[in-house]
Amino acid sequence: IILEQLASSYAVLTDDERELGVCLVDIGGGTTDIAIFTEGAIRHTGVIPIAGDQVTNDIAMALRTPTQYAEEIKIRYACALAQLAGADQTIKVPGVGERGARDLSRQALAEVVEPRYDELFTLVQAEIRRSGFEDVLAGGIVLTGGTAKMEGVVELAEEIFHMPVRIGAPAGVQGMLDIVKNP
């Protein structure tokens, strides 16, 4: 048995990042897992009970659409930073029950999504500060997980963390790379 954050780190972090100091943030469905590495070793772990499922629920509630459609809308159209989403781009939002679909701008969708990511990254920042390793993360932040792939996530994270942020993808994997490349 191996700690999930440690296993993920071997797939997506470089040796230099682990040595210089890096925070791995894995945004899952139900939780966001944090692992801080310095001097080549894991030094701190944490779990935040906010993740992709909460973003989906926010979309379902705000747009008054069933959860399965909210998940599809999140994956296909959502943007974590409203200023990057086009107000002129519209999406169809299915209604609940007998209610018909309606049009909504991508920017309006982003205005639902951005506050949840802001909250999540603010909680991650608080956990980093609590760990005492905030000043030794020369490698910055590496985001993984399906919800980390959303447009605007890196830009919003950089605004909040004030350090470099990148999306982590498995390195050194041969064959079927497109399948395993998703963080």
Where are these regions (language model features)?
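A short acidic Gly-Thr/Ser loop motif
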Residues: 24-31, 37-40, 51-52, 145-150
